[in-house]
């Protein structure tokens, strides 16, 4: 399995495709199959969401997926056991998306050790205060986990600079205020923010929250972005069908998304 940094290095100027799916929805076996399908049909990095009872940054599609997974008794140990097995068959590094409370509940060191031992390569904590990130980064570095920091569109230039300096690797630029979900259009303000951030750092920039169509992908790839995260569009296809049909749909959409990037 590749590291996150090596993916961006190997892609050079090509944009990375980063699908997001919720672990355990519609079931954990399907999640494992979905990881393999995404890896085979164009994903460069894969975000895997840890189901959580109060997902403040997530839109309704991902919230519902998280609730369904929790009702099945899906937990971190079951997810990591599945990941450890699947990791042997895929190249795309997995980034675990989790809220801060589950990390604190288990203990920062214990949590990061556990995900590293399962083969997780990256960690994304949307509600991690930048003021508390230094220790988390130090533990992640110890266990070869790349912590990805988020940058909101409402951030001041001073805060942008602070996050850029603190970020150990790539930076996740949130495309909209509010929660994740499918948005009908992208704003010129977002493009300007992207250009501003790119002038302030050479670190890789990935863009997510609200990207759901191949038209949006084609538009964004021209912004000199290093990676595009697509979440709700994949989760909706996977969870809105019987498992076999959902897997077929994410395979097709993953191919379409990749073609939109490389075309």
Curated annotation (Swiss-Prot):
Enzyme Commission number, as recorded: 4.2.1.20
Pfam families on file: Trp_syntA
UniProt key word Zinc-finger: no
Reactions this protein catalyses: (1S,2R)-1-C-(indol-3-yl)glycerol 3-phosphate + L-serine = D-glyceraldehyde 3-phosphate + L-tryptophan + H2O
Keyword hit for Transmembrane: no
Active site: 47, 58
Main enzyme class: lyase
Pathway as given in its UniProt record: Amino-acid biosynthesis; L-tryptophan biosynthesis; L-tryptophan from chorismate: step 5/5
Intracellular or extracellular location(s): Plastid, Chloroplast
Known role: The alpha subunit is responsible for the aldol cleavage of indoleglycerol phosphate to indole and glyceraldehyde 3-phosphate.
Subunit structure: Tetramer of two alpha and two beta chains.
Protein family (similarity comment): Belongs to the TrpA family.
Protein name: Tryptophan synthase alpha chain
Gene expressing this chain: trpA
